[in-house]
UniProtKB/Swiss-Prot annotation:
Enzyme class, spelled out: hydrolase
Record keywords: Disulfide bond, Glycoprotein, Glycosidase, Hydrolase, Signal
InterPro entries: Glyco_hydro_1, Glyco_hydro_1_N_CS, Glycoside_hydrolase_SF
Family stated for the protein in its record: Belongs to the glycosyl hydrolase 1 family.
Protein name as annotated: Beta-glucosidase 1
Organism: Arabidopsis thaliana (Mouse-ear cress)
Organism lineage string: Eukaryota, Viridiplantae, Streptophyta, Embryophyta, Tracheophyta
PROSITE patterns (alphabetical): GLYCOSYL_HYDROL_F1_2
SUPFAM superfamilies: (Trans)glycosidases
PANTHER family listed in its UniProt record: BETA-GLUCOSIDASE 1-RELATED, GLYCOSYL HYDROLASE
Gene3D superfamilies: Glycosidases
List of glycosylated residues: N216, N221, N441, N473, N512
């Protein structure tokens, strides 16, 4: 009951904040309502989809080591996309995808992260990209989706060491040279803020570094490494962006972006303290890396709070980082109520990212349907949360080009129930409708990618839940793919049908889906 009341509070607060935007839209819309050039796609990542972790010269990434050491579910086989990519591209074409987002496994392309290219890894990605292009699907490639080579972590501490900037730039150079004639959209780092917090502050994701006691880590320093790694990610991105502009852009005509995990923050009360805390949360989560990319330096509140533990950009570095991202990739699933806390001790007893931020964050997931909340209220919640985050980026950061690179709804992994995944359709309908509203309100949002095209190995969550438009039978050695109702809905939308919901629309959709199987 408390969760429901909290959600209702969130809806009321958002309605008050966005009364100027009008009602929660339930109007029909279609693909043609979006601007020409706006792209729709779906995505996967290498470790979550490929499998074949020890085939054809691939060597371990930090994910392989992290999961096997902890005896957790892993992506050793995952969807077996390495062997089934042609079948998957055919499904993408049948669905009507305009573009497809995927990542390259650094340790498959360059086994040790630097040095010689793995020829079989190179050929796989060439084949995959050519297959996409042959079917009229534009590749959108991420260079780093959490899974950097374990060799570099063992050799010099991975992202804690500036040496990785040179190695990452050399890896990107290979990708641009070998694939750039067919790839026009590159994202350097996926979810840079969450990769850093999870891997170096909390220690709950690879490489699993953090401060002890209080957390289960044997190495790391949450007080400093979180910010050092974030700094190195920004410098590596700037280095890669500079390389592309100097060596490839005139020939290939592509663009290079950077992606961040975005959360919609709302004050838990109308008190001044909570309003200030909400601004601080935005500065720590988004501004931490977005302000350097747009303005060339960290937010003032971070510099004041963190002090000497926050690395400093030299004048040259600031100039290189500023303006280095042609677009911002937004990963968006969550919203949160923020309460100010004057003293927020860390688990280890030393300052870390969470204690530096100085607030209590009650995260409410848009991924999980609260069944006791009326449908109309849930749709309003999704609608205004989406408007809120896109409006915030527009107003705070000069309206940069934005691609929503990940957004979707998880459901429990049940092959029978998942096939008719009506809650996912309702969620996607509300979210895409809100994106359309944001675009009409002036947001320079240029694309939307559903997460995920098919059920995947979900990072840290294994195979318990899934986001896919297509189900994958992970008990079947052949990993059979099957379309869900949401795949049918998304395909219809991409092919120009107006979205249709409500009881009559859902009944019609179920009927069409059943007859097409």
């Amino acid at each position: 009951m408390e969760d429901v009341l909290t959600l209702i509070t969130m809806i009321v607060l958002l309605l008050l904040a966005f009364h100027g935007f009008g009602k929660c839209s339930s109007d029909l819309y279609s693909r043609s309502d979006f601007p020409e050039g706006f792209v729709f796609g779906a995505g996967i990542s290498a470790y979550q989809w490929e499998g074949a972790v020890d085939e054809d010269g691939r060597k371990p990434s930090v994910w392989d080591t992290f999961l096997h050491c902890r005896k957790m579910d892993n992506g050793d086989i995952a969807c077996d996309g390495y062997h089934k990519y042609k079948e998957d591209v055919q499904l993408m074409a049948e669905t009507g995808l305009h573009t497809f987002r995927f990542s390259i496994s650094w340790s498959r392309l360059i086994s040790n992260g630097r040095g010689s290219i793995n020829p079989k890894g190179l050929q796989f990605y060439k084949n995959f990209i050519q297959e996409l292009v042959k079917h009229g699907i534009e590749p959108h490639v991420t260079l780093h989706h959490y899974d950097f080579p374990q060799y570099l972590e063992d050799d010099y501490g991975g992202w804690t060491n500036r040496k990785i900037i040179k190695d990452f730039t050399a890896y990107a150079d290979v990708c641009f040279r070998e694939f750039g004639n067919h790839v026009k959209f590159w994202t350097t780092i996926n979810e840079a803020n969450i990769f850093t917090i999870g891997g170096y502050n909390d220690g709950n994701s690879p490489p699993g570094r953090c401060s002890f006691p209080g957390r289960n880590c044997t190495l790391g320093n949450s007080s400093t490494e979180t910010y050092i790694v974030g700094h190195n990610l920004l410098l590596a991105h700037a280095s890669v962006s500079r390389l592309y502009k100097q060596k490839y852009k005139d020939i290939q005509g592509g663009s290079v972006g950077f992606s961040l995990f975005a959360m919609n923050f709302t004050p838990s009360t109308n008190s001044k303290d909570d309003e200030i805390a909400t601004k601080r949360a935005n500065d720590f989560y988004l501004g931490w890396m977005l302000e350097p990319l747009i303005y060339g330096d960290y937010p003032d509140v971070m510099k004041r709070t963190i002090g000497s533990r926050l690395p400093v950009f030299s004048k040259e570095e600031s100039e290189q980082v500023k303006g280095s991202s042609d677009f911002i990739g937004v990963i968006h699933y969550l919203t949160a109520l923020v309460t100010n806390i004057d003293i927020n001790p860390s688990l280890s007893g030393i300052p870390d990212f969470n204690s530096d931020m100085g607030e209590s964050i009650n995260i409410l997931s848009m991924r999980v349907r609260i069944s006791r909340l009326p449908n109309s209220d849930e749709k309003c919640l999704i609608f205004f949360i989406t408007l809120s985050i896109l409006e915030y980026i527009k107003q705070s950061y000069g309206n940069p080009p934005v691609y929503i690179l990940e957004n979707g709804k998880t459901m429990n992994q049940d092959l029978e129930l998942q096939q008719k995944d009506t809650p996912r359709i309702e969620y996607l309908d509300a979210y895409i409708g809100a994106v359309l509203k944001a675009v009409r309100n002036g947001s320079d949002t240029r694309g939307y990618f559903v997460w995920s095209f098919m059920d995947l190995y979900e990072l840290l969550n294994g195979y318990k839940s899934s986001f896919g438009l297509y189900s994958v039978n992970f008990s079947d050695p052949h990993r059979k793919r099957s379309p869900k109702l949401s795949a049918h809905w998304y395909s219809g939308f991409l092919k120009g049908k107006p979205t249709f919901l409500g009881s009559q629309g859902i009944t019609q959709l179920h009927s069409n889906f059943s007859s097409s199987r």
